[in-house]
Amino acid sequence: MDKRISIAIDGPAAAGKSTVAKVVAKKLSYVYIDTGAMYRTITYAALEQKVDIENEEKLMEVVKNVNIEFQQGENTQLVFLNGQDVSEVIRTPDVTNRVSIVAKHRLVREEMVRRQQGLAKKGGVVMDGRDIGTHVLPDAEVKIFMLASVEERAERRHLENMNKGFDSNLEQLREEIARRDKLDSEREVSPLKKADDALELDTTSLSIEEVVQKIMGIVSGVFAK
């Protein structure tokens, strides 16, 4: 497996992309790039500075002054904002409920895509997000589009919130996930969309291990060519 390829994993909110992408990256000894964490970091920075996230011009002032770095922790990936560890605070419901608004802005996405492509230049990456296969890494050798029902995704996020000690309401989560799906799918710039050459994977009734196994099978097929 000397060949180092790029793997793009796309899908809607709470489809399990990050969890699966991390495991796949670890198995391959690849770099994992969580593009969602980048948008979350921008969102967190804007909220901290009390910037109107609907105002693209003001948001870009935040973006220009934000340096985002990833470091591998013991069991997880750490995210740093200008040297500060923000790995936990960017996962709070406040950030989660606003990140799709930040991500809809054209100039913000263009800058994030530029940074993401820079990180992926040498290959050997697993990147997950909403527009990786269609826009960020259109030439990725493996493209996966992960799906799961709103109900399943709400239950996963509810469990995740409870485990982190966040207040969580299942019905509210269903509504928020459906709203994020709508925002992500209907935005003008790089909407959530399956790439024509992506393989669709419905994870509703699959465990993380089963999803990882399927993706590793696809990757092995590419290495065998």
From Swiss-Prot:
Its main location: cytoplasm. One of its GO terms (cellular component) is cytosol. GO terms for biological process: nucleobase-containing small molecule interconversion; pyrimidine nucleotide metabolic process. GO terms for molecular function: ATP binding; CMP kinase activity; dCMP kinase activity. Belongs to the cytidylate kinase family. Type 1 subfamily. PANTHER family: CYTIDYLATE KINASE, CYTIDYLATE KINASE/PANTOATE-BETA-ALANINE LIGASE. HAMAP family: Cytidyl_kinase_type1. This is Cytidylate kinase. It comes from Bacillus mycoides (strain KBAB4) (Bacillus weihenstephanensis).
